[in-house]
Design a protein with these regions (language model features):
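Walker B catalytic carboxylates
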Residues: 8
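A generic alpha-helix surface/boundary motif
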Residues: 27, 98-102, 164, 196
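Asp-based, Mg2+/Mn2+-dependent phosphohydrolase catalytic module
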Residues: 1-5, 15-19, 36, 43, ...
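Surface-exposed cleft-lining segments at the edges of enzyme active sites
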Residues: 90, 126-135
């Protein structure tokens, strides 16, 4: 029987549309930077932002690889093997997640401005609000979560997301009251499908993987990641799902059908 329900966020419980390519976003963000003495042209800021994301991600990846080798006496990381498997899939071994406030700190520094972390966080939140066209729950989400709670199931969030804005979006949608514990990737330095992210949740919350299920809309991050962690997985094929074939899911639900999902998780299907 399912006792622990582990949910993805965006595309699973939350419908969101962001457009970071909108020129108006960068025009307004450049104006915001200028308030603090960091002058950028909009397109220049956009390019500098993309470059910093790539640079910081690659630097963090290399740091993680060096740390893993050191912990294993110079040998490749062998901690994240699949339960019962003797081989590894390298593409899953390193899925680093940087903290976006570091990107904005660097962008200020490039213009000679020593911004503090608070300003960097607020800049990131402003950027997110500029680029978000809508943010809403899928129909029936709270009814479904309430039904799970009423029968005593544990509810967890495991999301590839940036804490500086996702934590606030969760509060704005009044979702935080439903979760026993929330895990956002930027707080842990790795993201799905990295086995370390799944293991962090399972170990921290002392979850029996035999009675737990992952629910998500991404075949690689959610479904394959869950399977590698020894979890059952339910795939929601929603408007935000990548174009993909999902063969490993234990169950597939077309659309964000919370009625069907509720029945499935309660053992009524």
């Amino acid at each position: 029987m399912i006792q622990s329900c582990i949910f993805d966020l965006y595309g699973t419980l939350v419908d969101i549309h962001t457009d970071e390519g909108n020129p108006e976003v960068w025009k307004k963000l450049a104006l915001f930077f200028s308030y603090y003495g960091a002058d950028y042209e909009p397109e220049e800021l956009k390019e500098a932002y993309s470059l910093q994301v790539r640079k910081l991600t690659e630097t963090f990846r290399k740091e993680q690889e060096k740390k893993a080798e050191k912990e294993n006496d110079g040998q490749p990381d062998k901690k994240n093997r699949n339960p019962g498997e003797g081989t590894e899939s390298p593409e899953y071994e390193s899925s680093p997640e940087i903290q976006m406030e570091e990107v904005f700190l660097q962008l200020y520094r490039e213009r000679g401005v020593e911004a503090d972390r608070t300003l960097a966080v607020h800049t990131g939140q402003f950027f997110r609000s500029l680029s978000t066209e809508y943010l809403r729950l899928y129909d029936g989400v709270e009814i479904m979560l309430s039904s799970l709670r009423k029968v005593g199931k544990k509810i967890y969030l495991l999301s590839n997301a940036q804490s500086i804005f996702t934590a606030h979006e969760i509060k704005a949608l009044h979702l935080d009251r439903w979760f026993d514990r929330m895990f956002l990737s930027s707080d842990y330095g790795c993201k799905k499908p990295d086995p370390r992210f799944f293991e962090t949740l399972l170990n921290t919350c002392e979850i029996d993987r035999n009675t737990a299920v992952m629910i998500g809309n991404d075949g690689t991050c959610d479904i394959q990641g869950a399977k590698r962690a020894g979890l059952s997985a339910v795939y929601l094929h929603t408007n935000l799902s990548p174009v993909e074939t999902v063969a490993e899911a234990d169950a597939v639900i077309e659309g964000a059908d919370m009625i069907q999902l509720e029945k499935l998780l309660l053992g009524e299907l």
